[in-house]
Amino acid sequence: MDLIPSTILTGFLGAGKTTLLNRILQEDHGMRIAVIENEFGEENIDNEILVQDSGEQIIEMNNGCICCTVRGDLIEALNSLARKRAAGEISFDRVVIETTGLANPGPVAQTFFVDEEVGAHYLLDAVVTVVDARHAMEQLTAHEEAQRQVGFADKILLSKTDLVDAAAVDALKARLQRINPRAPIATSDFGRAPIADVLDLRGFNLNDKLDIDPDFLRVDGEDGHDHDHQHEHGADCGHDHVHDASCSHDHHHSHHSDDIAAFVFKSERAFDPERLEQFLGSLVQVFGPQMLRYKGVLRMDGVDRKVVFQGVHQIMGSDVGPKWGENETPATKMVFIGKNLPKDVFIRGLEQCLV
């Protein structure tokens, strides 16, 4: 039996992974795609945003990150899909794993090589990293996770290039190529990337990954944890992407920056659209730089459909989504991910916007 091609879709918070995946799920490409996706936070919003009648299999694992704390769940999810496929219970051609925006893709990729059952059924096709052209420069400077995602990519897709000028795009491309000269770069504005830029790339080269991280195949527990650290280096540095034995900081895996946290707002009451717009506008003015990612499904007064709400830093938008299901209670569910955000200010303000 042929191995099932698998793609890891990664990128920092708000880069546009779900938008891209949604387009892939809607595109008439004749493929059946099993999706494994998860988000950082208590609530999973993406299963509300992703197309719900597309026929693809979506497995939610939102009790931790695929990259580490639910590694076992990822293995079980892949093996369970393979068993159900072999038994004829489900049908799919390939797998896409959408990681949380704070994930290091290295341990996710490692899963395909350290578990015999996974290796017997799946082939890791490529790691595709979506990069937000509007915010990437700041993210690459502030967050090591963003550098790791670029460093491990087999293909880089630039999103939101319409929000910056050509000079900024060129500068970002140059920086990305310094971090990862192996990965070709394409664009994916509004998720509009050709399917050929995402699937069947045959881009994953184990030897390249071992050059970047000689400990890539070392199983957790053999020596601390994973050692995958992609970093930028200046011209005076004698190596590309992996620290030598004399580097000055430790290699123990940090789950995520301790000052980054997620919180959830839920209510079955509808929002007053005008009050909510004013409050959210004031939030992004004051806390925008700290608001790494926020999204949700909203119940709005006078609107009989879901309203899908998303934002990154000061850039915020919403769209009218599908109708509420027959047996579904209309309710708002919002997730905010940020650095040192005052949860009580957000929650109190949102409550005051309810009808």
Description of each model-found segment:
Residues 155, 164-325, 329, 339-355:
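C-terminal accessory "lid"/substrate-recognition subdomains
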Residues 5, 9, 29, 41, ...:
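Helical mechanochemical/support elements of P-loop NTPase systems and associated helical scaffolds
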Residues 51-54, 146, 202-205:
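Short, hinge-like loop/turn segments at secondary-structure boundaries
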Residues 2-139:
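Nucleotide-state-sensitive switch-loop elements of NTP-binding domains
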Residues 9, 36, 132, 159-160, ...:
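A secondary-structure boundary/capping signal
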